[in-house]
From Swiss-Prot:
Organism encoding this protein: Mus musculus
Cofactor dependence: Mg(2+)
A Pfam cross-reference name: RAI1
Protein's name according to its UniProt entry: Decapping and exoribonuclease protein
Subcellular location: Nucleus
Lineage: Eukaryota, Metazoa, Chordata, Craniata, Vertebrata
Binding of adenosine 3',5'-bisphosphate, residues: M185, D236, Q280
Listed GO biological process terms: mRNA catabolic process; NAD-cap decapping; nuclear mRNA surveillance; nucleic acid metabolic process; RNA destabilization
Enzyme class: hydrolase
Catalytic activity: a 5'-end triphospho-ribonucleoside in mRNA + H2O = a 5'-end phospho-ribonucleoside in mRNA + diphosphate + H(+); a 5'-end NAD(+)-phospho-ribonucleoside in mRNA + H2O = a 5'-end phospho-ribonucleoside in mRNA + NAD(+) + H(+); a 5'-end NAD(+)-phospho-ribonucleoside in snoRNA + H2O = a 5'-end phospho-ribonucleoside in snoRNA + NAD(+) + H(+); a 5'-end (N(7)-methyl 5'-triphosphoguanosine)-ribonucleoside-ribonucleotide in mRNA + H2O = a (N(7)-methyl 5'-triphosphoguanosine)-nucleoside + a 5'-end phospho-ribonucleoside in mRNA + H(+)
Residues where substrate binds: R58, E101, W131, R132, G133, C217, E234, K255, Q280
Positions where Phosphothreonine occurs in the chain: T392
């Protein structure tokens, strides 16, 4: 659900003073996997700080009203036989992807809870605030061969904020999205409708509208290396029967994929799709991904559960596989790179980190539109209520 960013191609803006402060020793960051193959870095077990919901009109609510509950078909019953094409396009209300939400929903949550954060407001001054999806892209970067990305970064009251910008290539691809791909996107949401109920112990109702404006989001705290993190991500459902009832350990991620019939197909699945599933679920501490495998007619014929902590075992002995240590080490390196690059505390100043497959991460500096993303209502309220804080948390925070 993490929002995409601006739509216009960047025009480099003259910002003399900030440009002079860019560190000259580290102008770019390389991304080759071999550079990040060291031991797995420290990653603090994610803890949930709170949640919020977005309704059918994409309006924010600081509660769990949009949370759904995992309700799979009986284990000993017949196969699932879910028709993922049912209701398309008549009962489909997709989110308007032209609307640039940036970090706005997460920032509203931060405003409402800034005085209740564990460790006090001083903790936030040393943290990085972003969406889980942005971190997922960083984790998979060393192995990504097709899609580049851009991340806008601003420092305000000590906190580093990261917000994705839609690249021109991604925008062109989205606007030219073929009908089959649009239908496949619908199928993923339809699968959730077959697997989730509105209350614990309830039954799914796949007859209703699929509205992708609706979302339940968890807000989490963690730390990667010496980088405190506050991030949010959409949660598909909560499992009332989970051994641990404390979020995020009771959350379940739902996915769909085409049926596999050969070892080669499974090998490709493990190398590519499972990497993204792992990154997306490992970051927030979601323990299981439940996948529905669909046939060419769009029916789910089988379900399979992938424990997040066991996904790497499928590629451990594959020379062309991925390594979690590489993913996390690169993410930590990027955070260090960003923290040392974005040194000026100014919500109107943006460092744009850009990456294309095969190249390094590069940086350009911009002021105000079109890249500035911290809204005035957030900046003004934080400035009035909390004076700029210089305290940086210790690595053990």
């Amino acid at each position: 659900m993490e929002p995409r960013g601006t739509k216009r191609k960047a025009e480099k803006t003259e910002v003399e003073k900030p440009l002079n402060k860019l560190p000259r020793a580290v102008p770019s960051l390389r991304t080759q996997p071999s550079l990040y193959s060291g031991p797995f870095p420290f990653y603090r077990r994610p803890s949930e700080l709170g949640c919020f919901s977005l309704d059918a009109q994409r309006q924010y609510h600081g509660d769990a009203r949009a949370l759904r509950y995992y309700s799979p078909p009986p284990i000993n019953g017949p196969g699932p036989d879910f028709d993922l094409r049912d209701g398309y396009p008549d009962r489909y209300q997709p989110r308007d992807e032209e609307v640039q939400e940036r970090l706005d929903h997460l920032l509203r949550w931060v405003l409402e809870h800034r005085n209740q954060l564990e460790g006090g407001p001083g903790w936030l001054a040393g943290a990085t605030v972003t969406w889980r999806g942005h971190l997922t892209k960083l984790l998979t970067t060393p192995y990504e061969r097709q899609e580049g990305w851009q991340l806008a970064a601003s420092r305000f009251q000590g906190t580093l904020y990261l917000s994705e910008v839609e690249t021109p290539a991604a925008r062109a691809q989205r606007l030219a999205r073929p009908p089959l791909l649009r239908e496949l996107m619908y199928m993923g949401y339809k699968f959730e409708q077959y697997m989730c109920a509105d209350k614990p112990g309830g039954s799914p109702d796949p007859s209703g509208e699929v509205n992708t404006n609706v979302a339940y989001c968890s807000v989490l705290r963690s730390r990667l290396g010496n980088h405190p993190l506050l991030f949010s991500g959409e949660v598909d459902c909560l499992n009332p029967q989970a051994p641990c009832t404390q979020p995020p350990s009771c959350y379940v991620e739902l996915k769909t994929s085409k049926e596999m019939h050969s070892p080669g197909q499974w090998r490709s699945f493990y190398r590519h799709k499972l990497l993204k599933w792992w990154a997306q679920s490992f970051l927030p501490g979601v323990p299981h991904v439940v996948a529905g495998f669909r046939n060419p007619e769009g029916f789910v014929c089988s379900l399979k559960t992938f424990p997040t902590m066991e996904m790497f075992e499928n590629v451990r002995n594959d020379r062309e596989g991925w390594n979690p240590s590489v993913c996390m080490n690169f993410c930590a390196a990027f955070l260090s790179f960003a923290q040392s690059t974005v040194v000026q505390d100014d919500p109107r100043l943006v460092h744009l980190f850009s990456w294309e497959p095969g190249g390094p991460v590069t940086v350009s500096v911009h002021r105000d539109a079109p890249y500035a993303f911290l809204p005035s209502w957030y900046v003004e309220t934080m400035t009035q209520d909390l004076p700029p804080l210089s305290k940086t948390p210790s690595p053990k925070d």
